[in-house]
Amino acid sequence: MPTEALRPFFLFILLFCLITPLPAVANEVEETESSLDVMGKVLDHDYVEIAGKKIYLPRIFYVDGNFYFYSNTQSALESGEFVESEIGGIVRADGKPITIDFSISAHLIFFWLGVFLTFLITWLAARRYRRGVGSETEPRGVLQNLFEVFFVFVRDDIAKEYIPGEKYHKYVNYLFSVFLAISFMNLFGLFPWGITPTANLTVTATLAGITFLITQVSGTRDHWEHVFMFPGVHPLVRIILTPVEIIGLFTKPFALAIRLFANMLSGKIMIVSILGLIFVFTDMFGAWLGVGSSVFWVLLTALLYVLKGFIALLQAYIFTLLSAVFIGMAAEEHHHEDHESSVTTTAEATAKT
């Protein structure tokens, strides 16, 4: 895909990241002023905040074979069945933990929103292509052109590059969907009162788990032979290598989940921490220095928002790239003499990230 085709989009992202921080930073300052609890700003909540107003979400508990439904946390506490824990959260009135908590949280809401937008955009694009717009004629409109740019990018530069032969056709739809969904989820945090669901390990672990399942289902006979048998390797050496390969099957999705989670969480923590320095300086040196230094901290935070916008897309690309690499390794019909070449290709792809 020619780089020139992506330039208008990157220009749009740059302008978007320059404008968006203004209300977003103001919102962060307002939230940080009431509390300097950094982790409290990045953890999941039982509410979503829109225009400064909190909308509390339903609580659903499964306890001893029964489901309990409440409109919000306050209703659950008022029922007498549950009480607030000393370390946070809700437990049963007898002090025992809840068996399964199916409650809807803020991260889950924005996760669903990212999935919904991905489905909506792909459905609208598919409908236009069925009508011949883009297939028989040139794509029309900014959205369809952007859709085609990213789809061709994922297909040609990721799927076709790292999944052997014609097998990439089976996986390009998944890779494009996960790229689009993660991009949306990462970018949500740039909006005022927005939340980044990929800063939740449960979300990233779920996405990595899907890649893990697809990878194992795609595994060829050659792939599993190299996991358990190692053709051409001395039997005593297999005793060492086989456990390492089995562990490697699980460390790959683990690395996918942790990489995305850590990068998105650290960005939010850094922004809240820098804004918190305004109030630290105010408490330590007086209001005059706190207010005077606030200009610098707010400008620095605005620049971090710009960087965070690019990182949001970069992390979506890395997750998609590594997913394609892992699927390609499992789907490859290789022989023992080609194993070293396969490992080298994987190392090169990982080095790009």
Residue ranges: model-predicted function:
Residues F9-P21:
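Bacterial N-terminal signal peptides
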Residues P2, V25-T353:
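Selective transmembrane helix interface/packing segments
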Residues A5, C17-L18, L249:
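Hydrophobic alpha-helical transmembrane segments of integral membrane proteins
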Residues M1-F10:
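Bacterial N-terminal signal peptides that target proteins for export
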